[in-house]
């Protein structure tokens, strides 16, 4: 963050509530200003960098009472499963569905923040597109996004992700290379029926919802496609492996998923993703499948 925030950041990281209080009292704009680098606000920094701090709720309350913006930090809570601060933000008026576009619930599903997803649903978050319904395994709602002829209704939504569109990316706090990579990936997407279906299919796989995945396959989802909407761009098998869903992995392989496809970010197979996440048994299972298919 910008230099003006550095003493407050140090106080947050030291879990020093009194020091943060003194700094904000001396300069209330610390709570309301936006940084041009790294975390956009001090409250968002607290959400992400002080998740295990004993005084995190008191520090968050201090910033909220000083006028901090709430919706961005709520999405940050969704990205890291920070339920405790999220409850405070929601109680303080944060919009459970966000300020439009990408919602906190979508953020929670993208990052596999399961407690946050439950909290947001309990607080009234809406399941307003195909991606969310697939990620939650809501087969009853998935069918409602299709017309009788199999086409998608407008309510199915378009592909989206945490980093917004090109204008948001270009004005973000990422460095030049980070902005370039995100912009290139965003520009490669298509928002036709097939692409939206494939995106939703990966959400079903990443959360282990076999019934939802089957419904989407029945509607034409492509099992081995790497869809738009992801920075670490992989197949449904990659994401099932990352999140440790053995039954989903077996389902996908039984339905013809390739274990040899490499993701577009770091060039790993699903076995590599399982290894990265510490799922040793799944890694070994997938490695054996790779050997059998070589």
Where on the chain are the PLM-derived regions?
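Extended, hydrophobic interaction surfaces within ordered domains
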Residues: 80, 87-120
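Extended amphipathic secondary-structure runs
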Residues: 194-222, 226-229, 245
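Ankyrin repeat domain, specifically the short helix-to-loop turn at the C-terminus of the second helix
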Residues: 24-30, 58-69, 87-95, 118-125, ...
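Conserved ankyrin/ankyrin-like repeat signature
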Residues: 19, 55-59, 84-85, 115-116, ...
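Leucine-rich solenoid repeat scaffolds
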Residues: 106-121, 260-294
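N-terminal segments that cap or nucleate solenoid repeat domains
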Residues: 1-42, 136-154, 200, 212
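Ankyrin-repeat boundary/"N-cap" motif
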Residues: 2-8, 32-50, 69-79, 98-107, ...
């Amino acid at each position: 963050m910008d230099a003006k925030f550095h003493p407050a950041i140090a106080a947050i990281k030291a879990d020093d509530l009194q020091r943060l209080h003194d700094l904000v009292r001396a300069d209330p704009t610390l709570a309301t200003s936006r940084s041009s680098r790294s975390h956009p606000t001090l409250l968002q920094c607290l959400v992400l960098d002080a998740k295990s701090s004993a005084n995190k709720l008191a520090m968050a309350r201090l910033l909220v009472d000083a006028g901090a913006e709430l919706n961005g930090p709520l999405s940050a809570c969704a990205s890291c499963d920070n339920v405790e601060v999220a409850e405070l933000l929601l109680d303080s008026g944060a919009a459970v569905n966000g300020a439009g576009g990408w919602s906190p619930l979508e953020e929670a599903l993208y990052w596999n923040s399961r407690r946050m997803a439950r909290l947001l649903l309990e607080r009234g978050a809406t399941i307003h597109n195909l991606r969310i319904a697939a990620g939650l395994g809501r087969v009853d709602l998935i069918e409602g996004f299709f017309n009788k002829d199999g086409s998608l209704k407008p309510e199915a939504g378009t592909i989206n992700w945490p980093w917004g569109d090109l204008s948001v990316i270009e004005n973000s706090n990422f460095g030049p290379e980070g902005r370039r990579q995100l912009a290139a990936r965003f520009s490669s997407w298509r928002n036709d029926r097939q692409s939206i279906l494939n995106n939703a299919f990966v959400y079903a796989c990443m959360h282990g919802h076999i019934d939802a995945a089957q419904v989407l396959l029945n509607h034409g989802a492509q099992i081995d496609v790497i869809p738009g909407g992801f920075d670490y761009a992989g197949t449904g098998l990659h994401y099932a492996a990352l999140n440790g869903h053995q039954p989903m992995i077996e389902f996908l392989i039984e339905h013809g998923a390739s274990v040899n496809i490499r993701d577009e970010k770091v060039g790993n197979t699903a076995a590599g993703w399982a290894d990265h996440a510490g799922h040793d048994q799944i890694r070994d299972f997938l490695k054996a499948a790779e050997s059998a298919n070589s």
